[in-house]
């Protein structure tokens, strides 16, 4: 019988759809990258999503984040995301974690209960901690490298962290992971050299912060606020979703 996932089943098959329905995926960070990953996984039939983010929707998020609209500005991202995801698939389960992932709270998460972990956060400390905890439990994890200050979505690719180049974030991650004995890690990264954002005080988030009241990590506390657009982080998020779906189902297409 036809259902909302019938077109997806035409490609992946019934068994794969059953695997997706029975899977649980954790997405750490649901901004420009993680939001599109969550959207794609919900539209692909993943049964349970855990979404982790402590941020509120800001006016400046609207240019790139799928859960950010004029109506959701000021709301916690996980709340706005859950509402939309359940509109897409009312039968799925969405667990919200309104928290910022750091080593100090890592023990709140049991990584063994996840079929896959998505790292879409923007701090090196948090990313390293995610990788270490996921791999300790032998839970598959995929990490997003730098998506800010870039304009060519066609340059992004899936690779092992030790095969990456150019990306400044990937360089730091390689160094830190090697020190910790991590041998491999699937990432999505780009060889495009980052653009230096305009130094224009009139549009500076640090000078004219519009973060909603109650925002814990405001622009004024950041070393630099990167430039962004609608067509780069979204592509990264969709690439990640594709990898998660293919790995969970074991489907690789026509050889």
Q: Can you annotate each of these PLM segments?
A:
Residues 27-29, 52:
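Conserved N-terminal Rossmann-fold NAD(P)-binding element of oxidoreductases
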Residues 2, 109-113, 125-126, 136, ...:
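Glycine-rich phosphate/adenylate-binding loop
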Residues 46, 51-89:
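Glycine-rich phosphate-binding loop and adjoining beta1-alpha1-beta2 segment
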Residues 1-26:
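N-terminal charged helix/coil linker that caps or initiates catalytic domains
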Residues 120-121, 144:
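Short, well-ordered coil/turn residues at beta-beta hairpins
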Residues 33-34:
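Hydrophobic/small residue at the entry helix of a nucleotide-binding pocket
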Residues 98-106:
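Conserved SAM/SAH-binding loop
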């Amino acid at each position: 019988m036809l259902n909302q996932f019938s077109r997806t089943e035409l490609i992946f098959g019934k068994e794969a759809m059953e695997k997706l329905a029975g899977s649980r995926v954790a997405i750490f960070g649901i901004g420009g990258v993680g939001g599109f990953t969550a959207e794609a996984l919900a539209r692909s039939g993943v049964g349970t999503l855990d979404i982790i983010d402590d941020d509120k929707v800001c006016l400046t998020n609207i240019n790139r984040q799928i859960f950010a609209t004029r109506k959701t500005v000021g709301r916690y991202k996980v709340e706005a995301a859950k509402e939309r995801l359940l509109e897409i698939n009312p039968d799925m389960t969405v667990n919200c974690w309104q928290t910022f992932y750091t080593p100090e709270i890592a023990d709140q998460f049991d990584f063994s209960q996840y079929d896959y972990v998505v790292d879409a956060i923007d701090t090196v400390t948090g990313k390293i901690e995610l990788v270490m905890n996921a791999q300790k439990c032998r839970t598959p994890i995929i990490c997003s490298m730098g998506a800010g200050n870039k304009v060519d979505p066609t340059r992004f690719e899936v690779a092992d962290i030790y095969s990456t180049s150019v990306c400044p974030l990937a360089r730091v991650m390689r160094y830190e992971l090697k020190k910790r004995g991590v041998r491999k890690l699937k990432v999505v990264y780009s060889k495009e050299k980052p653009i230096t954002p305009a130094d224009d005080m009139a549009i500076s988030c640090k000078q004219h912060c519009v973060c909603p009241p109650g925002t814990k990590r405001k622009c004024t506390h950041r070393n630099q606020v990167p430039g962004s657009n609608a067509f780069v982080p979204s592509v990264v998020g969709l690439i990640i979703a594709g990898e998660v779906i293919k790995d969970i189902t074991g489907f690789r297409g026509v050889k």
